[in-house]
Design a protein with these regions (language model features):
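Alpha-helical structural elements of signaling/regulatory helical domains
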Residues: 54, 89, 189-192
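Alpha-helical ds-nucleic-acid-binding substructure associated with the helix-hairpin-helix region
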Residues: 63-128
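Structure-specific DNA junction-binding interface
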Residues: 1-86
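Short alpha-helix boundary/capping elements
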Residues: 50-58, 70-71, 106, 146, ...
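Alpha-helix N-cap and coil->helix boundary residues
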Residues: 57-61, 74, 78, 93, ...
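C-terminal accessory module of base-excision DNA glycosylases/AP lyases that mediates lesion recognition
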Residues: 1-31, 95-98, 102, 113-124, ...
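Short amphipathic alpha-helical interaction patches enriched in hydrophobic/aromatic residues
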Residues: 49, 83, 87, 142, ...
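Hydrophobic (often cysteine-bearing) scaffold residues that line and stabilize catalytic clefts
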Residues: 38, 42, 55, 94, ...
């Protein structure tokens, strides 16, 4: 049996409903990647730091409430307090990561000008709180669609379909790229880039398109 068949059947069922929402979100991503300021890019990087072990919805809410200026200017203590008020599970550590990442402001446009694999490796090395999944999330959210965001929900779907043997408890580059290749096969069958296919899967799971 085709291991992708069950997932593809589900995706085809929701494709028509999800498409206008996905296209709207994709336009936001392309606009941010092509004309976003360093500060806007840093806000998106901070969003990706926040969503790790939390939720996209929570990250969107925090990004809106704290704002670009808050991510750039608030003290670590004040940022931690704000994140705590917003219900983040790890407010102190995430505030620390965001503050430590401020050295990347004025370098992010250069980083995203590299190929996606090179930009991803650089972000994993230089940014606090940014691993393989989070760096892929950031790059997708600025319109680089060839990367896959291997979130636990995506991994669960791949595992249940028999596409992967187990769900990793942590990531090495080799392991991430190996499973990303499986996801890329799924995306190719669906007819969309990996970063776009992810949004359709999230619509299939949640009935909405976040980021």
């Amino acid at each position: 049996m085709d291991k992708f068949e069950k997932i593809l059947t589900g995706l085809k069922k929701i494709e028509g409903m999800a498409e206008p929402l996905v296209e709207e979100r994709m336009e936001e991503f392309r606009r941010l990647g092509s004309s976003g300021s360093e500060e806007e890019l840093f806000s998106e990087l901070s969003f990706c730091v926040l969503t790790a072990n939390w939720s996209a919805g929570g990250g969107i809410r925090a990004q809106k409430e704290i704002g670009i200026s808050g991510f750039i200017n608030l003290s670590q203590e004040e940022l931690s307090r704000r994140l705590s008020e917003l219900g983040h599970r790890f407010p102190h550590k995430r505030a620390e990561f965001i503050v430590k990442n401020r050295h990347l402001i004025n370098n992010l446009k250069e980083i995203i000008s590299f190929s996606a694999p090179d930009a991803r490796r650089l972000l994993v090395r230089e940014a606090k709180g940014i691993g393989w999944k989070e760096s892929s999330h950031f790059l997708r959210n600025i319109g680089q669609l060839e990367v896959a965001i291997l979130d636990r929900h995506i991994l669960k779907i791949l595992h249940e379909a028999g596409c992967i043997e187990d769900i990793p408890s942590g990531w090495t580059e080799k392991k991430y790229l190996s499973i990303e290749e499986r996801f890329r096969e799924l995306a190719e069958r669906f007819g969309k880039p990996p970063g776009e296919t992810d949004l359709y899967i999230w619509y299939m799971i949640k009935g909405k398109v976040e980021k």
